[in-house]
Design a protein with these regions (language model features):
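C-terminal functional module detector
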Residues: 1-29, 34-70, 201-203, 236, ...
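Catalytic cores of extracellular degradative/oxidative enzymes
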Residues: 74-247, 251, 257, 276
């Protein structure tokens, strides 16, 4: 199996340009004369690109980079939920250089190869200033049912790390585990369960959502135009069925052609101490946003993402506010209600700051969120677009339940597809394990089927 990995040092190649990660000091041989320097430090600093004059006898050079906002001082923690193939100490250096507070470094199985497993028993590694932490978890993978980021969990790997599937488990390996089994084990240890690179692979994703086996969905800004992207559209379908799942983001970094935190999560801890457990609690509470550049903050009737608004019968007007700042220009901010744009503001030439305030009419139960988009183009070889999206503020209306027929049909298709695959194509394990997997999928189907009938949807 071909593996394109980074396990040799701290450098990065963005498109055709190579960079080095440094801790604030470095030595380099430079020619006398004009040279160009480029510096970045994540999403809260002004990027620098300028020409310098190097004198023939010069031995020292001082370079400065300025911070235009400090969200850590406002109670926010920024994290990459999904990183592979670097050592914890290298992850600390790269995380500090990218302005990250938390890197979730994931051990994984790749056929006969196991990576970063030996880093798990030592527990988290913390930078000297206490502001950057590397937490080693696992990515547990099944090539049809799906992948999970299992974070935290008392520094114990969740075995088996893969179950069936070429390039994931052993050749010819049986379906020993479902994603639900892995999720339950991680949660029993106090860990956080994230559906990796939602929704692919997709088969058990629907069952996991219906049974409440996942804490958040990891989204990538890659496919499609702007938010016309199946990752976001499928998330909207899930939300429209009343399943409250916040958004997170990670890079799935596997080599030096993508920086840690190029796609990242912001979570609001407020006055709580920065620990992994408090970060996981903040993720579950839902005050998060994912971003590949812009910093996006949202309130609806002064409620933050993850919180509820209760309206009277028939709904009412809700005052929404979105604020965005970015180290690169962006062009539009939007408010979405149940996935539909209900307010927007656009600057055709691009801006670095924008605020959108509106009153929107909400006639029934649902959710509100903010999103913003830049037209500056792709930022990495993984085709990441520049955008941000908040988790929702939820709207309650008496005696009405949020449920979507098309969303339910989507989830049911996933569940029934998983059942068909297990029965016809999967390499079967022993009878007891097979029964447990069958029962899990059957329970998910029955639960969704019951909700559909409660809403007059015949299936």
């Amino acid at each position: 199996m071909e593996m394109r990995v980074q396990d040799y040092g701290a450098d990065i190649k963005l498109m055709d340009t190579s960079f080095a990660y440094i801790d604030g000091t470095f030595q380099a041989e430079l020619p006398a004369g004009d040279v160009y320097v480029e510096m970045t430090k994540g999403f809260e600093y002004e990027a620098v690109r300028k020409k310098l004059r190097i004198e023939s006898n010069q031995r020292e050079l001082k370079l400065e980079i300025s911070r235009f906002t400090d969200n850590r001082s406002k109670g926010w923690v920024t994290a990459d939920t999904h990183v592979h193939f670097i050592s914890p100490s290298t992850a600390i250096l790269e995380g500090q250089a990218e302005g990250l507070n938390l890197i979730n470094l994931l051990a994984a199985q790749w056929g006969d190869l196991f990576t970063n497993v030996g880093d798990i028993p030592q527990g988290p590694l913390t930078s000297r200033d206490g502001e950057t932490v590397v937490q080693v978890g696992t990515e547990n993978r099944q090539h049809i049912l799906g992948h999970l980021c299992l974070l935290g969990g008392r520094a114990e790997p969740v075995y088996p790390m893969s179950a069936g599937g070429p390039q994931e488990s052993y050749l010819g390996d049986a379906l020993w585990n479902s994603l639900a089994d892995w999720s339950d084990t991680c949660r029993e240890r106090g860990g956080l369960v994230i559906t990796a690179h939602f929704p692919y692979p997709a088969a058990e994703v629907g069952a996991g959502i219906v049974l409440g086996k996942t804490d958040a969905l990891e989204l990538y800004p890659d496919f499609g135009e702007e938010f016309n992207n199946l990752r976001f559209l499928y998330w909207y379908r899930v939300l429209n069925c009343g399943y409250r799942l916040p958004v997170v983001a990670g890079t799935d970094k596997m080599a030096a052609w993508i920086p840690v935190g190029a796609n990242r999560t912001y979570a609001h801890l407020g006055q709580q101490e920065f620990t992994f457990d408090n970060w996981a609690k903040a993720i579950r509470s839902g005050n998060t946003f994912m971003t590949s550049g812009p910093l996006l903050f949202f309130h609806a009737d002064s409620r933050a993402p993850g919180e509820e608004i209760t309206l009277g019968a028939g709904g009412g007007a809700v005052e929404v506010q979105a604020e965005a700042r970015s180290f690169v220009p962006f062009h539009r901010v939007e408010i979405v209600l149940n996935g539909r744009v209900v307010a927007s503001r656009e600057e055709r030439d691009g801006v670095r700051e924008m605020t959108l305030r509106e009153k929107v009419q909400v006639n029934g139960p649902g959710w509100l969120a903010a999103r913003c988009f830049s037209k500056v183009g792709l930022t990495t070889s993984w085709d990441l677009k520049v955008l941000a999206h908040t988790s929702p503020v939820y709207v309650q209306v008496p005696r009405q339940d949020l449920f979507s027929e098309s969303g339910a049909a989507f989830l049911m298709t996933l569940i029934e597809g998983a059942q068909t695959w297990v029965e016809t194509l999967a390499t079967r394990p022993d009878a007891e394990r097979l029964h447990r997997i069958r029962k899990m999928l059957s329970d998910a189907r029955d639960r969704l089927h019951q909700r559909m009938h409660e809403h007059g949807i015949h299936h």
